[in-house]
């Protein structure tokens, strides 16, 4: 009897974390591509964001860059919840209570300057030891996203233009 109980405890301890992960990534299956840039949110699960508004609408994006675009475009809506992919676990966490890292040597998603969220401050500090950057809160990360918006948008346009030109060259 003791062995059955121990086996049951072991099975549950292995199954429960796995079940939690599939539930926290359900947002990806509901909205696979970013509303603004079309990028695959599953590929960018470590930076993806979800914004739930008080009117019952929600938006799924690939990054804080695209979240900033949505928040600016929906100035008359009030966000009820803003979630972001934890850089370490890829699970959605509350963006406003997360510890953020701005900058460092790892380029951002849709941005030259990275902006990464962590549920645990010590994981953010470990990231900084390996990659550089500075600790920040959500407000500072969002401010950085808006500050970077012009140069990032210009960079994205230039990259897409170069891609289109390469595609045209290959057609001829």
Annotate the PLM regions:
Residues 17-172:
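Intrinsically disordered, low-complexity terminal tails/loops enriched in metal-binding residues
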Residues 7-15:
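Bacterial N-terminal signal peptides
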Residues 1-4:
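Positively charged n-region of N-terminal signal peptides that target proteins for export
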């Amino acid at each position: 009897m003791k062995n059955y109980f121990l086996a049951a405890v072991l099975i549950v301890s292995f199954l429960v974390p796995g079940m939690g992960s599939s539930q926290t990534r359900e947002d990806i299956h509901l909205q696979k591509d970013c509303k603004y840039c079309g990028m695959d949110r599953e590929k960018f699960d470590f930076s993806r964001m979800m914004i739930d508004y008080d009117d019952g609408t929600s938006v799924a994006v690939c990054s804080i860059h695209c979240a900033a675009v949505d928040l600016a475009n929906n100035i008359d809506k009030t966000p009820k919840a803003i979630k972001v992919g934890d850089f370490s676990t890829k699970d959605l966490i509350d963006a406003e209570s997360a510890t953020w890292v701005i900058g460092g040597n790892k380029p951002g998603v849709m941005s030259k300057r990275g902006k990464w969220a962590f549920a645990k401050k010590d994981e953010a500090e470990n990231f900084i030891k390996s990659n550089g950057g500075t600790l920040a809160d959500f407000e500072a990360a969002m401010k950085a996203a808006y500050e970077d918006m012009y140069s990032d948008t210009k960079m994205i346009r230039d990259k897409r233009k170069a891609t289109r030109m390469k595609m045209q060259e290959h057609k001829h």
